[in-house]
Design a protein with these regions (language model features):
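Short, structured interface segments
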Residues: 39-48, 234
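Allosteric cytosolic regulatory segments
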Residues: 30-41
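Sensory-domain boundary capping and coupling elements
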Residues: 1-19
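Metal-dependent catalytic cores of enzymes that make or break cyclic nucleotides
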Residues: 17-27, 51, 55-259
């Protein structure tokens, strides 16, 4: 039995009948109305439950991102910046609020596979050897394996597994080409590369915004989707360094919570 009120149903006067100007609701009508309000209550509670599940889902994604940042000291904040840039590209494309949130969440955990990489390699204060670089290149595959058993996170798989694919088919791990690469992965690829170029590392200073944009533009049609490259350059030229992801897109639970 419910012990709390979640809403009220207000009934106006019942239309008068031929024989009575002040008709009353019959017991049968009241029974039907009671059944109707019960169904409404169930629908409302289910909606509230979906919202609660969605909030837990979002918090889980943020926790994963925080864990990644804690392991890789030199790329602290990388996931959030990539998410910001990726959502910016999505807005330039005119994507829906639900699609924007999908992009935000996918890009937030795009490097989840690095959890399976040794901290000694992630935090090495210098350039990586060829063997170490191969190990780093395994993180998209490791990330997809981490997500595989978690059905609610499987919708984020393309951004995790394929953000290092190239438009010309020379990327990894699957060697996908052109539009065979999922849209979210093509978006994250640009955002991820831009942030990597403009971020400082122990062994080098980050590139300026202008030089990084020139490099991105040079790689349009080879490494990156040319149309998305144009969208990115339009967005980044308006980008403010203190910009954060604004919560102006609402959850699309049909996309995010599918089993």
């Amino acid at each position: 039995m419910r012990r709390h009120i979640i809403g009220t149903l207000f009934l106006c006067n019942k239309p008068a009948s031929t024989f009575s100007p002040l008709s009353k609701f019959t017991s049968e009508e009241l029974r039907l109305l009671s059944s109707f309000t019960h169904q409404i209550a169930i629908a409302i509670e289910n909606h509230q439950l979906n919202n609660s599940i969605h909030s837990i889902f979002i918090d889980y994604i943020k926790s994963i991102s925080a864990a990644l940042d804690a392991r890789d000291a030199y790329t602290h904040g990388h996931s959030k910046r990539v998410a910001t840039y990726s959502v910016g590209i999505g807005r330039e494309l005119g994507l829906t609020p639900g699609e924007l949130e999908f992009i935000e969440l996918s890009s937030t955990i795009h490097d989840i596979g690095k959890i399976g990489i040794s901290s000694d390699i992630l935090n090495k204060p210098g350039r990586l050897s060829d063997e170490e670089f191969k190990i780093i290149q395994s993180h998209p595959h490791k990330g997809s394996k981490i997500l595989e058993p978690m059905s609610r996170l499987s919708v984020l798989m393309p951004g995790v597994r394929n953000h290092h694919e190239r438009y010309d088919g020379k990327g990894y791990p699957d060697g996908l080409m052109g539009d065979d690469i999922h849209l979210i992965a093509r978006i994250i690829s640009i955002a991820d590369t831009y942030d990597a170029m403009t971020s400082d590392r122990v062994y080098r200073k980050g590139l300026s915004k202008e030089i990084a944009c020139q490099e991105i533009e040079k790689c349009a049609g080879t490494q990156f989707d040319p149309n998305l490259t144009t969208m990115f350059l339009t967005y980044i030229n308006q980008y403010r360094e203190n910009e954060i992801i604004k919560a102006d897109h609402k959850p699309d639970t049909a996309i995010l919570l599918q089993a």
